[in-house]
């Protein structure tokens, strides 16, 4: 003020910009004026967006590819997560450029703009999302993502600019915590419910209702693949075992194939399935009792009234905790009745289809029979 009074002789001669430009702006204060740190709002917004882009990934994984969620490997989870980030890289820039927000950010009351309040261009939004993926999420890799998230949290809460924030500002509205919690919980509940529904739908067989032998065979092949029982053998349209041939694949042993099924058919409709296995040896590998399990599931899960809401109940019936391969077992589902009988002569040890004689030099005889039929 003293300088102005000395140097300016009249109000009309005053040029305020000459004096204002001499001040150094406080970058940290400027950042606080734009938006106070809200790390958890940003974190949950990102989580909602990732959950949403995970839905089409789950659709392909379960509905189209019929993957068994109980046997999905950690590597497959990582690949699916990377695909989800890839979708986010495609979709988020479009949403930011068009609306200034995403579904997750909207739930948390966040908009992303340029410092002047204008929306980002597509290229600016794409660059921002790519930097979030690289620096903030560590390319979506386990452990790396955890470390990057922690470091970003520390920088952000100290008021430092994050790698992807240059040229953009996140603005937060004044909505209450209750509203955000409700929207966040609802979003995750919807995503979780849809994902579980798709995983359960993957268990349903391709053919439903009254089955022909060919349709039954297709169901058996479906479940053998679903439960990863090998690709060497499959049932043909006549319900007989056929050895699959693959380029550069040579099989050793087991050339006779699994024990065959026999069928009872009335007016073209499959009414009953029968299976029997017998062998005498000191060591018996692979009785093929899993095929009896798949046969029951192929017939039972096809019945009217079986849906994604109860498919787990019939699948549980064939689990090793319920159906032990060396013991008699019976089950029923809808109008399908099944009986499995196991007769073993001699002292033995059993484990997952493997029989071992406990008497040196003395063989055991294993006889297994299976019958599944539609109730009259």
Q: Over which residues does each language-model region extend?
A:
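Surface-exposed amphipathic alpha-helical segments
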Residues: 294-305
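Extracytoplasmic/periplasmic C-terminal soluble domains
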Residues: 311-376
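Membrane-interfacial and juxtamembrane segments of integral membrane proteins
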Residues: 3-291, 305-317, 327, 332, ...
């Amino acid at each position: 003020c003293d300088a102005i009074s000395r140097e300016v002789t009249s109000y009309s001669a005053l040029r305020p910009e000459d004096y204002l430009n001499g001040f150094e702006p406080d970058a940290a204060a400027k950042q606080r004026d734009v938006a106070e740190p809200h790390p958890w709002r940003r974190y949950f917004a990102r989580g909602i967006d990732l959950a949403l882009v995970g839905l089409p990934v789950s659709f392909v994984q379960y509905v189209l590819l019929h993957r068994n969620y109980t046997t999905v490997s950690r590597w497959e989870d990582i690949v699916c997560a990377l695909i989800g980030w890839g979708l986010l890289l495609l979709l988020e820039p479009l949403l930011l450029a068009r609306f200034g927000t995403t579904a997750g950010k909207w739930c948390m009351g966040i908009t992303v703009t340029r410092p002047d309040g204008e929306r980002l261009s597509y290229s600016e939004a794409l660059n921002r999302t790519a930097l979030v993926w690289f620096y903030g999420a560590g390319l979506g890799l386990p452990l790396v993502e955890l470390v990057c998230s922690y470091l970003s949290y520390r920088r952000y809460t100290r008021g430092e600019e994050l790698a992807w924030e240059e040229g953009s500002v996140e603005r937060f509205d004044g909505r209450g915590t209750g509203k955000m919690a409700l929207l966040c919980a609802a979003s995750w509940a919807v995503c979780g419910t849809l994902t579980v529904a798709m995983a359960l739908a993957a268990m349903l067989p391709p053919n439903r209702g009254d089955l022909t032998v060919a349709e039954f065979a297709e169901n058996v092949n479906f479940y053998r693949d679903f439960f990863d029982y090998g690709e060497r053998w499959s049932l043909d349209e006549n319900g007989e075992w056929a050895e699959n041939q693959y380029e550069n694949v040579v099989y050793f042993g087991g050339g006779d194939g699994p024990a065959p099924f026999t069928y009872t058919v009335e007016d073209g409709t499959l009414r009953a399935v029968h299976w029997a296995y017998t062998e005498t040896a000191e060591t018996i590998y692979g009785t093929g009792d899993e095929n009896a399990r798949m046969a029951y599931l192929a017939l039972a899960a096809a019945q009217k009234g079986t849906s994604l809401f109860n498919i787990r109940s019939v699948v549980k019936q064939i689990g090793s905790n319920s159906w032990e391969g060396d013991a008699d077992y019976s089950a029923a589902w809808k109008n399908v009745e099944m009986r499995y009988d196991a007769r073993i002569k001699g002292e033995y040890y059993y484990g997952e289809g493997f029989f071992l004689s406990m008497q040196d030099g003395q063989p055991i005889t294993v006889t297994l029979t299976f019958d599944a039929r539609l109730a009259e």
